[in-house]
Every structure is written in structure tokens, then in C-alpha cells.
Swiss-Prot record:
It is found in: Cytoplasm. Its EC number is 4.3.2.10. InterPro entries: Aldolase_TIM, His_biosynth, HisF, IGPS_HisA/HisF, RibuloseP-bd_barrel. This is Imidazole glycerol phosphate synthase subunit HisF. Heterodimer of HisH and HisF. Keywords: Amino-acid biosynthesis, Cytoplasm, Histidine biosynthesis, Lyase. Belongs to the HisA/HisF family. One of its GO terms (biological process) is L-histidine biosynthetic process. IGPS catalyzes the conversion of PRFAR and glutamine to IGP, AICAR and glutamate. The HisF subunit catalyzes the cyclization activity that produces IGP and AICAR from PRFAR using the ammonia provided by the HisH subunit. The keyword Manganese does not apply.
Length: 253
């Protein structure tokens, strides 16, 4: 039976965890290492660091942060944001990341996914896709959701996997931070189109929304952030509901 995963996302800027709505209006929510340890203790299956500053000046700060966090964690740590080259991926993995998500750089140069998969293995390469509803399809955006492309999200997900991505992190820009639930139609469309795990992201407002991502969206994993940072719910409460609903998840014991 498929074990579903609960992934906690920490958006990092200037060495701190921040949160906003639709990638805007950021506020400070805490120290990354402390929050990572807390969420692991609560039962998170995986952690994702997204460097949303993506500035060269702060890149060294990020690697040091990854190193400090990875030393404290036993669960997998994924890192993304501003990853542009094979060397960037190598640096993240050497700092202690288990996986690296690639977004804008893959759109600019799709061969980067193949190069990274060949060098480090597909299991280390996550295609991060930010998508926004556009009529009867979803358009891919880059640069933190600011720059529209001509790519269709479902077709792009297929291409990313064909080029070597071992996982897809799929974020609905429309739902990001809105807490109205994941975009289940988008999640299902991509989940049905690829044969690698899909992480649903953007819109979690309750444990029931997470359950819907699995049961209705067909996701393999669900990413949560703001509702945990703000104490709306807990990892334990989400997992309890998933377990009651018959979904197979990892327990703390």
C-alpha cells in the first residue's frame, strides 16, 4: 500500500522562515533550524527549504543553514529556490540535502534536469512547478510566480519526468496561502500524467484539505506550511485524520 507523506515547507529569506499569500506580503515566523526540529518531532515525513530570496549574496547563508539543519534531522530534507546549475545541486547535496528542487532554471534550460539526474540520480531531482489557472488549462510561471511562460503545466510535468525528474512539486499560485484547499483538478491532472510521486502544494487550510489532496487529487504527498506555523492545526492532528480515513501514513513509533 502506498504510504502518503506529509511535507512541511519552510520558506526561507535572510536566514529566517517567512510566509505570505500568493508569494507576497511576507512575515517572519521563526528560526529555520528550530522549526525543522519541531516539525520532525511532531511527525513530519519530510522538510522542504525554499530560498525565496534567491539572491547570490544570500546563497552562502542558505548552504550554511542547510548544513546546520541537516545535522539535526533524521527525515529527508529537500532544498530549492535559485538553483541554477549542476554545481548548485551538488553544493546543496554536499551541505546535507537529500533532494533538490529546480524551477525557473529548468524552464530556461530543460537539459539541466537530465544533467542533474545523470550525475546525482533521479531520486535527488525534484521538478518544482508553479502553475496558475488560465481558462481550461494551467499556465507555468517562473521567478517565484511572477513571470508567465507559454508552458502548459501538465505537458511540462510530463517533459520534466521524461528528462529525469524523480518527483514533481506542484504549487497552485491561485491557492498559495489562501487556505481554501489545494487545486484538486490541477493535482489530479498532473498525478495522472506522470509516473513519479507528485507533491500537492498551495492552499492547505485544514487537515480535511490534506486528505482531499490524497483522496481526490491523487497526490503522493501534500505540502503544508502556514497552517502549522500559525497553529491552526498540527502535524499530529492532520495525520490522525488521515489515519482515520484509511490512508496509509508513517507513524512516529
Amino acid at each position: 500500500m502506498l504510504t502518503r507523506r506529509l511535507v512541511v515547507c519552510l520558506d526561507v529569506k535572510g536566514g529566517r522562515v517567512v510566509k505570505g499569500v500568493q508569494f507576497e506580503g511576507l512575515r517572519d515566523v521563526g528560526d529555520p533550524v528550530e522549526l525543522a526540529r519541531r516539525y520532525e518531532a511532531e511527525g513530519a515525513d519530510e522538510l522542504t527549504f525554499l530560498d525565496i530570496s534567491a539572491s547570490a549574496e544570500e546563497r552562502d547563508t542558505l548552504w550554511e543553514l542547510v548544513r546546520r539543519t541537516a545535522e539535526q534531522l533524521f527525515i529527508p530534507l529537500a532544498v530549492g529556490g535559485g538553483v541554477r546549475t549542476v554545481d548548485d545541486v551538488g553544493r546543496a547535496l554536499r551541505a546535507g540535502a537529500d533532494k533538490v528542487s529546480i524551477n525557473s532554471a529548468a524552464v530556461a534550460n530543460p537539459a539541466l534536469l537530465t544533467a542533474c539526474a545523470e550525475r546525482f540520480g533521479a531520486q535527488c531531482v525534484v521538478a518544482s512547478i508553479d502553475a496558475k489557472r488560465d481558462g481550461d488549462r494551467w499556465r507555468v510561471y517562473t521567478h517565484g510566480g511572477r513571470k508567465p511562460t507559454d508552458l502548459d503545466a501538465v505537458a511540462w510535468a510530463r517533459e520534466c519526468v521524461a528528462r529525469g525528474a524523480g518527483e514533481v512539486l506542484l504549487t497552485s499560485i491561485d491557492r498559495d496561502g489562501a487556505r481554501t484547499g489545494y487545486d484538486l483538478a490541477l493535482t489530479r491532472a498532473v498525478s495522472e500524467a506522470v509516473d513519479v510521486p507528485v507533491i500537492a502544494s498551495g492552499g492547505a487550510g485544514s487537515a480535511a484539505h490534506v486528505r482531499a489532496a490524497f483522496q481526490e487529487g491523487g497526490a503522493d504527498a501534500a505540502l503544508v506550511a502556514g497552517i502549522l506555523h500559525d497553529g491552526v492545526t498540527t502535524v499530529g492532528a492532520i495525520k490522525a485524520l488521515l489515519r482515520e480515513s484509511g490512508l496509509h501514513i508513517r507513524s512516529l513509533t
